[in-house]
Structure formats: C-alpha cells, structure tokens
Amino acid sequence: LPLGFYECPYPYKRILSPKVVEFCADSGRFYFLKDTCCDIEGIRKKLEIMKGSNMKLYNANTSTLLESMKYGAAGYSGVMANFHPALYAWLLENWEKEPEKAEYLQDILTPCSFIELKNYPLSAKTYLAKEIGFSIKARTRKNTADYISETELSELRQIKELSDRAME
C-alpha cells in the first residue's frame, strides 16, 4: 500500500527530520511528502535524500516553489491552489520553458498567498463562489469567523484582478 506524509503546518508545526525522510525513502513504501517547512535548504536536503526513491516532494509554500522545482520537487500541494489553480498549473507546466514569466508569476503569487492568513478556509470558499462562480456554499467546520468582512471581500476581488492580469 503506497503511503504519504503531510507535514503539519498548523497549529503545531511538525516537520519530518532528514533521518525520518531517509527511513521513509529507503523503505520503498512512501510515495508522497507534502512539505510545509517553508525553508529552501530543508527542502533541498529532503530532495537529495529522496533522489532515486519512490518518494516525491510536493511543496506547499509559494515563495519557495520555483526554487524547489529547480532542485527536483515534483509539484505543488498548497492551499493557494484553491484560489489560483490555473496559475499554479501554468507555473508547474511552464517554468522550464518560460523561466522569466515563471519568476514574474511567482512574484505575484507569493504576496497573494498572504490571504491564507486571513480567515482561511472561509476566504477560499468565498473566493471560489463570488470571484470564480463556483456553485458552493461558503461554510467551514474550522473555528473562524462565520462571515467575510467587506474589507476581506475587497481583498479577494483585488487578488482576482491581480491574478487575471498575471496571465495577460
């Protein structure tokens, strides 16, 4: 049975040590690591350990994403894909072919990712419903505010506008 790990980013940061990553990679049973360390040197070390194994690293942090891809990360597995799935897909598919545009896009996506710190996941569900047009209700089991303020709605609209311009 192929297994994977999701490092816990919140509320208590739980990151796999290089020793644990080595054990998992050497076992042959682990195929997936959602990395949440947000540290390119830590990511680079894990990728070096996993080289040649079944285990693949998926970065959850936007600001280190492009550099992690250059070191061999397999992809992205962060919550911001709830806001910008097409932009992350483009980045992952085209970063080698169009490196300057990929850098530009990451420069936009990184500050956009700060919205994650405000009322997530309700903000993502509201964004998908109001800005993208998905037919979903903005409900969540997480203990956050039960509404999005006008300021937050304005921020979500601005993120949508910025992400639309990013692909022009």
Predicted features along the sequence, with ranges:
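Short beta-strands and strand-loop turn motifs
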Residues: P2-C8
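Catalytic alpha/beta core domains of metabolic enzymes, predominantly
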Residues: C8-K118
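C-terminal alpha-helical cap/extension of soluble enzyme domains
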Residues: A73, M80-E168
